[in-house]
Regions:
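A short, highly charged nucleic-acid-interacting micro-segment common to nuclease
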Residues: 174-186
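N-terminal accessory/pre-domain segments preceding catalytic cores
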Residues: 18, 22-136, 140, 257-321
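Alpha-helix capping and helix-loop boundary segments enriched in small/acidic/polar residues
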Residues: 39, 112, 180-183, 207, ...
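Hydrophobic/aromatic-rich core segments of domains that either
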Residues: 187-255
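Secondary-structure boundary elements
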Residues: 110-177
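Hydrophobic (often cysteine-bearing) scaffold residues that line and stabilize catalytic clefts
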Residues: 117, 138-139, 184, 188, ...
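Sec-dependent N-terminal signal peptides of Gram-positive bacterial secreted proteins and lipoproteins
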Residues: 2-22
């Protein structure tokens, strides 16, 4: 444990040394799940923004378009927005032109919770991102930041597994993970996705069965880096105080090899099928810890904190130590 604590402090210092942080001053509440945005029109997006503004202002209803299908697309986008946890229930009016909201909290509680979530997200992002980072470096930096921010909530999982009615079990969302410092696989995925959305990096979600038990579900992100899609699993890479890269940047075949016999997964995406074909990040998988050096390279370490090599984050070349 002492080795890991020393190494983590070294990694953080290396990632921050000599460079001012690129400050985000506010969260973009208008972000849309990437694949959902793909089937929304520009007009849908404007109504979506209008609805977000209405929720933030605690309006009881918002007037949408006269097109019911378009309004369903807007609702689909809303349901994937991290601030939507403040809405307990929504319903359309009889003409399906207005969306009415019932809020889960008082006005002051809602404002406090959203402000807290924004503050914690900004702190996490600004504490990890440096000016000039490319997409891979941003993805790596936020991977480390998410793993450092929350721990896996085994008590929650045990309670879920023993619950008589899982549909009534409290919903997982970002605020819950940030406020408790704990979460499950969905929490890691949602946090990672939301952070990357703020940085303009495309992130989707995979759902699947990773243990051979069809009732034992799992969720993890897929990230688009340099035009290629890669599967990542921050839940499995959580080493307690830092992230390993054993499951970062996997191809579909590498992901299949990481599970057990009968392992299946599918993309929780309106895109349909997304291929993760590239294996050029495979050298990263040997790292039990890493540090971004600031010159477009990642220093990889083994479980004892010994440097094992350097990975070029631009060319994806690896030089063993």
């Amino acid at each position: 444990m002492r080795i890991w604590k020393t190494l983590v402090c070294t990694l953080i210092a290396a990632m921050l040394a000599g460079t001012a942080l690129a400050e985000l001053t506010e969260m973009n509440h208008y972000v849309v799940k990437a694949d959902v945005r793909a089937y929304m029109t520009d007009e849908d997006l404007e109504f979506y923004k209008k609805a977000i503004d209405a929720i933030l202002a605690r309006e009881k209803e918002v007037r949408l378009s006269d097109d019911y299908d378009a309004n369903l697309r807007v609702l689909g986008a809303l349901s994937n927005n991290p601030i939507y946890f403040v809405v307990e229930k929504e319903e359309f009016n009889s003409k399906h032109t207005k969306l009415r909201f019932k809020y889960a909290y008082s006005e002051s509680e809602q404002a406090e919770k959203i402000a807290y979530m924004d503050e914690e997200m900004l702190k996490m992002i600004n504490g990890a991102i440096q000016p000039g980072m490319n997409e891979l470096e941003q993805a790596l930096a936020m991977y480390q930041a998410v793993v450092a921010r929350i721990d896996y909530d085994y008590e929650w999982l045990d309670a879920l597994n023993t619950s008589d009615d899982k549909f009534l079990f409290p919903q997982i969302e970002i605020y819950q993970a940030l406020s408790t410092g704990k979460g499950v696989c969905h929490s890691y995925t949602f946090l990672y996705e939301y952070a990357l959305q703020q940085l303009g990096v495309e992130c989707l979600r995979y759902i699947g069965n990773t243990t051979g038990d069809p009732d034992d579900g799992h969720m993890w992100p897929v990230v688009r880096i340099g035009g290629e899609y890669y599967q990542c699993d921050p839940t499995w890479d959580d080493q307690g105080e830092t992230a390993s890269l054993q499951y970062f940047g996997m191809s579909d075949s590498e992901r299949l090899e990481s599970g057990v016999e009968g392992f299946e997964f599918s993309l929780d995406s309106a895109y349909g099928e997304v291929k993760c074909d590239s294996e050029d990040l495979k050298p990263l998988h040997q790292a039990m810890a890493f540090a971004l050096s600031g010159d477009h390279s990642a220093i990889l370490y083994d479980s004892f904190g010994t440097e094992i090599g350097e990975f070029d984050t631009e060319t994806h070349g690896f030089s063993a130590k």
